[in-house]
């Protein structure tokens, strides 16, 4: 029992220490120009505020919002993480907490089918940009998405952009990663994603 108590305290300390310099953002205290386009991604170290861009990628944003409103992303792993480059999540089939399939994670589907790539509108993939992931083929976007942690100009016209992080990017920079692999064992998870206005 004593060992368990020490372990629990140690785990709590590590989590608190990991998030020590991350400012937690309260979206209710921020005035947004277009609050209907704001999604709040909650992770271990706090809130990440995403502004969605339906005029740039209407189909992609619609799919994302549909999944957010159904709470499909809750407790889904950040299964692919490249330090200082990107975090990827959204495998609804093989990435759910308590039911992860490490052999298949990253290949799962939402059950809604794929959608077409939206890559014709100009978009600068600056740090914090949010986009839908796909296979090596275009028009295979579904539920998985990624957020870049640095500027990625070569992603323009390659991936469907759906928005950009406007607050809280620091919380994503604390997501667990592995030095020798892009795919993470015992990963961090999305707690919830909610639209600011339902």
Report each predicted region and the residues it spans:
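Cyclophilin-like peptidyl-prolyl cis-trans isomerases
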Residues: 1-198
């Amino acid at each position: 029992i004593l060992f368990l108590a020490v372990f629990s305290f140690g785990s709590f300390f590590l989590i608190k220490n990991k998030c020590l310099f991350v400012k937690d953002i309260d979206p209710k205290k921020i005035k947004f120009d277009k609050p209907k386009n704001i999604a709040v991604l909650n992770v271990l170290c706090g809130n990440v505020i995403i502004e969605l861009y339906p005029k740039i990628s209407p189909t992609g944003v619609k799919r994302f919002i549909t999944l957010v409103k159904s709470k499909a992303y809750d407790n889904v792993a950040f299964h692919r993480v490249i330090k200082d480059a990107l975090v990827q999540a959204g495998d609804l089939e093989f990435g759910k907490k308590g039911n992860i399939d490490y052999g298949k994670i990253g290949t799962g589907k939402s059950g809604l089918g794929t959608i077409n790539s939206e890559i014709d509108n100009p978009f600068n993939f600056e740090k914090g940009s949010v986009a839908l992931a796909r296979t090596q083929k275009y028009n295979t976007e579904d539920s998985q998405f990624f957020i870049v942690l640095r500027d990625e100009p070569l992603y323009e016209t390659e991936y469907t952009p759906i928005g950009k992080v406007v607050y809280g990017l620091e919380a994503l920079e604390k997501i667990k990663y592995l030095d020798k692999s892009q795919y993470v064992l015992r990963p961090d998870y999305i707690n919830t994603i909610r639209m600011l206005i339902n």
